[in-house]
Amino acid sequence: GITPQRDFIMGGKWITYTAVASPPFVTGLGRDRRDGNREDFRNLIKLTQMLNCLHTTAGYPVEPTDIHASVRHLYATHDAVTLSDKPPFVYSLGRQRNIDGMEITRIARGVNQETFNSEPSIFSVINASTPLRYDTVMLHGIQEMSSRNQVICITPFTLAGAMAPVTVAG
């Protein structure tokens, strides 16, 4: 993580509790459902920081769709490392996004490349696209993260309608 007291073990006999990952909408406190935005994203990062029952976020607590997708990861990672000291997350949606996320995290920790490469500080989750299929950008994410000894969670999870059929064939 950003600070050693937030470090935790992921995998094996350990369970990791995280905030929700990337819902497109947000609601609450008498406000109607609305598209995800940076203000709500930042507020949810702060809430996650205050909830000691959560180890980290596991994506964006809401997708900040008011930030262009080409630079969204830069703003989101910056907010994650400045508003929370819990280990940040980077989406593996292309090699450069992983590199950017790792560099932002390294700078936030105030460590050199060698230290960063020897101390896992950021993680990514790779979900199979369709049953056991991993696309090029996912593989690039795995390569970039593993080349710097950072954490990658690889899951067989597929989401109906997004990475798999909406209904089960019958």
Which functions belong to the PLM regions below?
Residues 1-21:
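Glycine-rich, N-terminal phosphate-binding loop and its surrounding beta-alpha-beta segment
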Residues 25-170:
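Helix-rich catalytic cores of soluble enzyme domains
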